[in-house]
Amino acid sequence: MEIKVLECLKRLEEVEKQISDPNIFSNPKEYSSLSKEHARLSEIKNAHESLVATKKILQDDKLALSTEKDPEIVAMLEEGVLVGEEAVERLSKQLENLLIPPDPDDDLSVIMELRAGTGGDEAALFVGDCVRMYHLYAASKGWQCEVLSTSESDLGGYKEYVMGISGASVKRFLQYEAGTHRVQRVPETETQGRVHTSAVTVAVLPEPAEDDEEVFIDEKDLRIDTFRSSGAGGQHVNVTDSAVRITHIPSGVVVTCQDERSQHKNKAKAMRVLKARIRDAEVQKRAQEASAMRSAQVGSGDRSERIRTYNFPQNRVTDHRIGLTLYNLDRVMEGELDMITTALVTHVHRQLFGHEETA
């Protein structure tokens, strides 16, 4: 890891020289690219300095502890060593994650689709809980969320919830949320105190960039239907045909949007989802053709694959792909997902590039 840090620090000096050149402003695109690289490298530098300083304090405490005789001071130093060791471990993981080379698609916005699976009303309620969890996580990362489409269940929660999320490194941290999320808990309507199991499926679809030439949709290939939007229980909530259903005839992909009162806005949102789904289908097809990529994936990303279990009675969350088990489910449901998402990103990087690059 030290070698990688030195390489980054050397590159940071080069970038700072390039940015300080007045001629750089004549090329806005290059300036923007260098500014982003400078921010990433500066973060690595700061994290490395924090780690070095913490290691020095820990070393001093251990040295003092080896010669100290006073019981009170010994107890204080022992506590300092314990705190220092935890800090070194945490800062090392943080630095390791920062050293992961950025993917050009890391900053792409994503469309996240959550659907109730097995478990009926309880599954729909858990969709609502997951929606809240992801909104809180997004807020903690400074990301923006936009509701694209919802289908409420009769007893609360959602049969389906689709939202767009944008911001720095959105795709990097959310792409591995795709799959089946299983929940084990006692429903509020359960009188015998029995634990029920239900499931929610999650799809994470990167939105194509505006200049992405891979995604071209011919208007001739679309069938667009309009109808009155309806809420929970099927009752109509709008007297005009504002809801939109778009069918991409060649692929058979169908997208419905009815949350907005404006037909124009519903159509625009539906087109965003449609483009993301078509792009995702192409990406999945290429991934399946690349055996090297398949072997390095954290699971298949298939919605039918069970990736995580949320056990409320035990306050436990387990990610089955990397064997990670945490006993702080309450914190995870409050949006503290970094402890899982960063572990997944690190795991994938180690598989793709080998542990020696970050060790």
UniProtKB/Swiss-Prot annotation:
Q: Which domain of life is it from?
A: Bacteria
PTM comment text: Methylated by PrmC. Methylation increases the termination efficiency of RF1.
Q: Matching InterPro entries, A to Z?
A: PCRF, Pep_chain_release_fac_I, Pep_chain_release_fac_I_sf, Prokaryotic/Mito_RF, RF-1
- The keyword Signal appears for this protein: no
Q: Which UniProt keywords apply?
A: Cytoplasm, Methylation, Protein biosynthesis
One GO molecular-function entry: translation release factor activity, codon specific
The UniProt entry lists the main location of this chain as cytoplasm
* Localization in the cell: Cytoplasm
N5-methylglutamine PTM positions read Q235
Its family remark reads: Belongs to the prokaryotic/mitochondrial release factor family.
Instruction: Please give the function described in this protein's UniProt entry.
Output: Peptide chain release factor 1 directs the termination of translation in response to the peptide chain termination codons UAG and UAA.
| Protein name in the entry | Peptide chain release factor 1
Q: Which organism is it from?
A: Chlamydia trachomatis serovar D (strain ATCC VR-885 / DSM 19411 / UW-3/Cx)
Q: What is the lineage of its organism?
A: Bacteria, Pseudomonadati, Chlamydiota, Chlamydiia, Chlamydiales
